[in-house]
A protein has these predicted regions:
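Catalytic phosphate-donor-binding core of small-molecule kinases
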Residues: 47-54, 68-71, 232-235, 277-288, ...
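Catalytic core of DAGKc-family lipid kinases
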Residues: 118-119, 125-133, 137-149, 156-157, ...
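Short glycine/serine/threonine-rich phosphate/pyrophosphate-binding segments
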Residues: 184-188, 210-211
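Gly/Ser/Thr-rich active-site loops/lids in small-molecule metabolic enzymes
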Residues: 265-273, 314-340
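Short, solvent-exposed S/T- and G/P-enriched segments that are highly enriched in secreted/extracellular
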Residues: 378-383
């Protein structure tokens, strides 16, 4: 990384540390000068969270009651702050400082990783779905842009078998494969590319493009992603599979998977998930008939949701949450979420997570699941395993080449120390691989 790149990191780190200092001073001042009002405001926020959770996990009148109480308590809290104009201004400064701290921290740890040079392929092929991502392939004229770069475009038409198309292209001499579409389609291309040891490029023309983000591809530069096959760089990443089916991101079981299975999910995603919540997490919920073994070898039969991912996700953090720092740790990420248990307090951590090269989930019948966002039903037991360094990924030289959270430390203390080092001129570097089960 060049010295020129280090200056923006240093400025961002200084801004993050300054914002954190302002945030701490003002927060302490409000609590001390407004005692006991500050504690009352905090209690109101806790009550609002509890009421909101109660409403989400119920149906009918109980849901309306919980939601109504939460809204009322928040309104009272805002009214209390407005009644004191001076402290309202302080509260607004706190919110602004918090936002600046998060944005500056994200910028301070954003890195560009130089990857290994690789020769351009002679016959690269791009598969694209015109409907994916609201029509991004058509909007950005990807077929024409591909031809201009010597890449053969093949449109995925309605009802076509994508895997059959890909294998046909390989048989006809394709020596590199790219996909412009959603993550489910990316997994199909990646599977064939890994089997044939061919270079693969992920073109972010889907709806969310989670795989592209964690690979270090600029999701806003859809056309530029085609340069992966023109002066691009290469890295190897892991894939994962469940019962022989390859996935690039994750497999979800439980709440999200139940919602994805429902007829109205694609038209009203949030509403469908909210309607599913009481059935999975509520007091009258049917729960999940799942059996799995934890990292200590103990058998379990509970959990509101299970997420098995191709490498570990960063969860529960203000910055970088929902991304994977690496996709080459050679380990599955396993997260089991549970409904809150009475007597353990409101702020109990609602999930447990660990990493392992393999994982198994069993049940008495088949299991509804979401594989890279696509609804499926799987026969049990579900056997997951990581496929280490299975995929040769090509990435445009101008793109970051690393996940947004690749250099992000774990924990507030480690983050503060790292920001201090960056502010003194040190450049952020990717975190080390795990390389062990924990």
């Amino acid at each position: 990384m060049s010295a020129e790149q280090g200056d923006p990191h240093r400025l961002a780190a200084l801004a993050a540390l300054a914002s954190a200092g302002i945030l701490a001073v003002l927060s302490i001042d409000i609590v001390l000068s407004q005692f006991p009002r500050g504690l009352i405001v905090l209690a109101c926020l806790v009550l609002a969270l509890a009421a909101a959770w109660y409403g989400l996990t119920r149906t009918g009148g109980a849901r309306l009651l919980g939601s109504g109480i939460a809204i009322l308590v928040v309104a009272v809290t805002v009214a209390v702050l407005i009644a004191d104009g001076d402290h309202l201004a302080q509260a607004l400064v706190i919110v602004a400082s918090l936002g600046l701290m998060v944005l500056a921290t994200r910028s301070a740890f954003r890195i560009h990783v130089p990857l290994q040079w690789a020769p351009d392929p002679r016959h690269p092929v791009l598969f694209y779905n015109l409907k994916s991502g609201g029509g991004k392939a058509e909007k950005f004229h990807l077929a024409d842009e591909a031809r201009a770069r010597g890449i053969e475009p093949i449109e995925l038409k309605l009802g076509a078998d994508l895997e059959q198309l890909v294998r046909g292209a390989v048989a006809d001499g394709a020596d590199a494969l790219a996909m412009a579409g959603g993550d489910g389609s990316q997994a199909v291309i990646a599977k064939v590319a890994a089997e044939q040891d061919l270079p693969y490029a992920c073109i972010p023309a889907g709806t969310r493009n989670h795989f592209a983000l964690d690979l270090g591809i600029d999701r806003d530069d859809v056309v530029g992603a085609l340069d992966a096959f023109v002066g691009g760089r290469e890295r190897r990443v892991d894939l994962a599979e469940v019962n022989g089916r390859v996935f690039v991101n994750n497999v979800s079981i439980g709440l999200y998977a139940e919602a994805v299975q429902r007829e109205g999910y694609r038209e009203a995603k949030l509403r469908t998930i909210l309607d599913t919540l009481p059935e999975v997490l509520g007091p009258e919920g049917k729960g999940l008939d799942l059996r799995w073994t934890g990292p200590g070898g103990h058998e379990h039969s509970s959990g509101a949701a299970i997420l098995v991912s191709n490498n570990r996700y960063r969860l529960g953090h203000a910055v970088g949450s929902g991304t994977r720092p690496r996709i080459d740790d050679e380990l599955l990420g396993i997260t089991v979420a549970s409904a809150p248990v009475a007597g353990r307090g409101l702020f109990q951590r609602p999930w447990r997570e660990w990493s392992a090269p393999a994982f198994e989930v069993d049940a008495d019948g088949s299991i509804a699941a979401g594989i890279d966002g696509e609804a499926v039903t799987l026969d049990t037991p579900l056997r997951f395993r990581i496929l280490p360094a299975a995929l040769r990924v090509r990435i445009a030289a101008a793109h970051p080449g690393a996940s947004p959270s690749a250099a992000m430390p774990e924990g507030a203390r480690e983050t503060a120390l790292a920001l201090a080092r960056i502010s003194m001129g040190r450049t952020p570097k990717p975190q080390h691989r795990q390389r062990k089960e924990h």
